[in-house]
From Swiss-Prot:
One of its GO terms (cellular component) is plasma membrane. It is found in: Cell membrane. The keyword Secreted does not apply. It comes from the Bacteria. Its main location: membrane. This is Uncharacterized lipoprotein MG149 homolog. A lipid is attached at residue 24 (S-diacylglycerol cysteine). It is a lipid-anchor. The keyword Lipoprotein applies. A lipid is attached at residue 24 (N-palmitoyl cysteine).
Length: 320
């Protein structure tokens, strides 16, 4: 898997809107908002994100390259040993190639965590483009001129058992009204950050269960003569395959969760309380009612929706 330094084209998918509900505001400190973003990632990986994320984009690339080199070195040794044991052992060569491909990949969960924390430390590098129906024209605008200048932030939550909508066969997704119930458990699904210039940046980080693709494999039947002629190397190879099948079965029973990231930004004529923003977003997405959200634009000097289209590693200095 090749990693490109222009991270956003891979890891900041352009999403028009995400399902956000009522937010809970927190103190106006950058450290608190950064810590809150960490809470979006999986519990068992959190410490790893904190340690590696603070090291920056170079650490991400270094780690990825190191893993790739290790995989290549292991592959070379394994391939050499396989050829020495039996040059015509197609079975082992195939196994080696498969192990190669899986070992060379950089963990996406870790990269998501690294990237989120790196971006929040370098917000001025984000380049935005106003959302339009014309996809051929892309403006790149720097809306955040200073790093770490977050005004406020709050969690975006949904009811644990609530689904925001469903997709029909024609591909259209419809939202449905629902009633709130007292004591209903809520889960955090995202984070909203506000800035002094009226910009609201929303990050939606969801967990998706990873389902392995079923692969059809044809195996040749063996008679007693084949068993006698089977080499020790071939026997070891078949034992390894049997163990791998058991591991895959366990992974299927306990599927690994992958992270899905989406970001959107809304620019108003002036800043206002983040609770008012998330409250309006709640009615827009959960209740399919955009009236309150549109009224924010009228109340605060207009509103423009932006998507994050790129990242500038050398952003221009703000003019005084």
């Amino acid at each position: 898997m090749k990693l490109n330094l222009r991270f956003p084209s891979y890891f900041l998918p352009v999403v028009a809107a995400s399902a956000f509900l009522v937010s809970c505001a927190t103190p106006n400190t950058y450290e608190v908002q950064r810590a809150a973003l960490i809470q979006l990632v999986e519990e068992d990986e959190r410490q790893n994100y904190i340690q590696k994320g603070s090291m920056g984009a170079n650490a991400v690339m270094t780690a990825a390259k190191a893993e790739t080199k290790t995989a290549e070195k292991t592959a070379t040794s394994t391939k050499a040993a396989s050829i020495e044991l039996k040059k015509t052992d197609t079975d082992i060569k195939t196994t080696t190639t498969t192990e190669n491909k899986s070992a060379s990949g950089y963990k996406l969960d870790t990269l998501f965590g690294d990237y989120i924390l790196w971006v929040v430390d370098h917000l001025s590098g984000l380049l935005f483009s106003p959302k339009t129906n014309n996809s051929t024209t892309t403006q790149k605008i720097q809306l955040i001129t200073e790093d770490k200048m977050i005004l406020d932030g709050g969690n975006l939550t949904v009811e644990k058992n609530h689904e925001h909508g469903h997709t029909h066969k024609n591909g259209e997704t419809h939202e449905h009204d629902h009633d709130h119930h007292e004591g209903e458990e809520e889960v955090i699904v995202g984070r909203a950050l506000s800035f002094a210039n009226g910009l609201f940046l929303v990050v939606d980080l969801k967990e998706e269960k990873h389902e392995e693709k079923k692969e059809a494999k044809s195996e040749m039947s063996m008679n007693s003569k084949d068993m006698v002629m089977m080499t020790k190397t071939e026997m070891m190879s078949k034992e390894m395959k049997s163990e791998q099948k058991m591991e895959k079965k366990e992974e299927h029973e306990h599927p690994h969760k992958k992270l899905s990231l989406s970001t959107t930004a809304y620019k108003f004529g002036q800043s206002f309380n983040i609770l008012e923003f998330t409250g309006a977003m709640h009615h827009k997405t959960a209740h399919n009612n955009e009236t309150e959200f549109k009224n924010l634009g009228k109340k605060y000097g207009g509103m423009t929706e932006y998507t994050i289209v790129d990242f500038d590693f050398n952003p221009p200095k703000p003019t005084k």
